[in-house]
Amino acid sequence: MIISVDHGNKSIKTPNALFTSGLIVSEGLQGFKTDYICWNNKYYTLTEQRIAYLRDKTEDERFYVLTLFAIAKELERRKVPETLDPIDITLLVGLPPAHYEQLHSRFEQYFLRRREIVDFEYNGKYYSIRVSKVLSYPQAFAAAVTQFGTLKAHSVAYIIDIGGFTIDVLKLRSGHPDLAVVESFEKGVITLYNGIASKCKALYARILEDCDIDEVIRNQPTVLPGEVQQLIRTMTNDFLTEFYNFLRERGVDVSTSKCVFAGGGSLLLRGMIERGNKVAFPIFIEDIHANARGYELLYQSEVAANGQQ
């Protein structure tokens, strides 16, 4: 069984599921009706409070448990019955392009776990799985693959994947990667959230959550006072301006280049990017699951090329 998981610092995505990269661990069920997993005699529930940024997600067990949630949600979606017989899984994952060479081997082994059988309970259902193969792909390029039919018409374009903590930038020529520009910057929307929250607390003694900031950026109804809203908008515009200048220093001029924006951060910032009129040709990949779906397309292409099943 093929299961594709995009491990974001802000959220976990499969082709069909989306949830925050946050966990609470306890010794027993808490009595609330929430998704849970019992594994290794511990209970894990999802929370909207995301995990602090980890450049190397193999440092502890949390992203492994989040992956069990992702697998369980896909099994549930596909109506796979609970079973004590191990389900063999080929797991498709991704990493920022600039981190790929350094981290991909460790990342794959983290999930492979010597192909051991893993038993767990998900929302009262019992599953047994064995991750028999793990394949990793570059994020951003995977998202671009889902739009290859459109991108191959452009002689040069830049895919800009704005995630939770990283922004990945990849140059494309006729839809194919040009390794002259492969960058991953630790300047994702979590850094914006942290900056806004810190300044708001200092100036107005208010504690903001990510969702409070999202409401203002998206022009949604909010209970925040006007001065806080203005602070959020000003700092978000400054964040984008700084990012555009950062790109320009690296040879990417958004005022003259075709820029293809992907990732949840791009969708969050879309309105401000478009209203700012600093990006001449913005194209948005609206599917937040694009990387996860792209891993599947890349895997299918490899299978077809190798004549494997």
What are these model-derived regions, one by one?
Residues 1-157, 176-191, 211-309:
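Nucleotide/phosphate-binding catalytic cleft detector across ATP-hydrolyzing
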Residues 160-164:
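Active-site-proximal alpha-helical scaffolds that flank and shape metal-associated catalytic sites
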Residues 167-171, 181-182:
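Short, acidic (Asp/Glu-rich) active-site segment that either coordinates a divalent metal cofactor
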Residues 200-203:
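Acidic, metal/cofactor-coordinating or nucleic-acid-engaging core segments within structured domains
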